[in-house]
Amino acid sequence: MCGFLVWLYSLSMLPPMVVALFYKEKSLFVFFITFVIFFCIGGGAWYTTKKSGIQLRTRDGFIIIVMFWILFSVISAFPLWIDSELNLTFIDALFEGVSGITTTGATVIDDVSSLPRAYLYYRSQLNFIGGLGVIVLAVAVLPLLGIGGTKLYQSEMPGPFKDDKLTPRLADTSRTLWITYSLLGIACIVCYRLAGMPLFDAICHGISTVSLGGFSTHSESIGYFNNYLVELVAGSFSLLSAFNFTLWYIVISRKTIKPLIRDIELRFFLLIALGVIIVTSFQVWHIGMYDLHGSFIHSFFLASSMLTDNGLATQDYASWPTHTIVFLLLSSFFGGCIGSTCGGIKSLRFLILFKQSKHEINQLSHPRALLSVNVGGKIVTDRVMRSVWSFFFLYTLFTVFFILVLNGMGYDFLTSFATVAACINNMGLGFGATASSFGVLNDIAKCLMCIAMILGRLEIYPVIILFSGFFWRS
């Protein structure tokens, strides 16, 4: 299996090769070398182990999930590292690779606009591949080869209700999710093009927007285009991509939008999104940065981008009031819906925590009443409640830990907070010293933020469980 997935991932070097060939860029050779190396390594390993017939256990699923996200990050960094014209150290290339494949969108490259077009496309492609998860794509293919992947899929799908199955045929479900994801990307590309964005930029931004990755073809990000329609498209597709993709699957399979209307998590998420947009609009309008129309457009885009952990930005977001940026950074912890390409804690968990808090208040008011926590008409079990509280505690603990470590390295508190929020939430937008580039971080800080990005993307548990002594017992 390991060899097959490496071999499969090596094929992702072919599209950048086509782009480099079309634009007659020297990076063609770099991508070709990367393709050949990992095609041979992966193919050789697959050929020697494909008849082993080893059955995966739950423990193996967790190990493989973490191992492959690390492995794919290293492979993603390889072409960036070996190209001498980019002048990136291995740590810088690794940071860029991890940021791309985890859909974080943070970059150490100061002048993105100067990159060859093959690399601009490649970075957006990393976002797209990482968006729904390399494992989801693998699970759609592996069953056809007679390799069981159910345990991997259960480990990858986030959320307290992740054990629920969509259909009896996992491969069909995964394939439908991938097709839905691709169609959303195509729709975004078309809308960007209609809004006036050049075709190449539209393709790159389209696939990075629906993945909520945030890599751009310009150093100024979306602000480069100075176009209200482009910002509306980016904000709208950021919100759409924050929907639970299970809902998109049900909508397609049942040919009805009722699941979107009835889903309590989605309604809660949209309510929070509306509140964040309104508050942000009022703040920037109140201080006179823009007129009322401009305040709404810019706030709709940036609030949607940061709330959903997309990370695309307007050119002058760093000049916004500090309290507004801090408010948006805090909103990035909220994230979107469970089962989406968002980072963050996710809206369903916050909804459960809110319901639990309300339940405790009611219980204190009526000590003898037999009350329960209900979400969408269903009673939340103690097991789910423990899972949500445990996740919230661990997420907060790691966030505080990383902030204190960066602050101890000499970075000011705002820079430390913004950097950690950008990485662990897979949001990608820094502030303070990292507003324009994360290249200002030292190598140790970059490595720590790589860990934060992977922790955020895998939602902590698959990583930390590997350090549990109980996990390794027979």
PLM feature spans:
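Membrane-proximal intracellular helices of multi-pass ion channels
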Residues: M1-S474
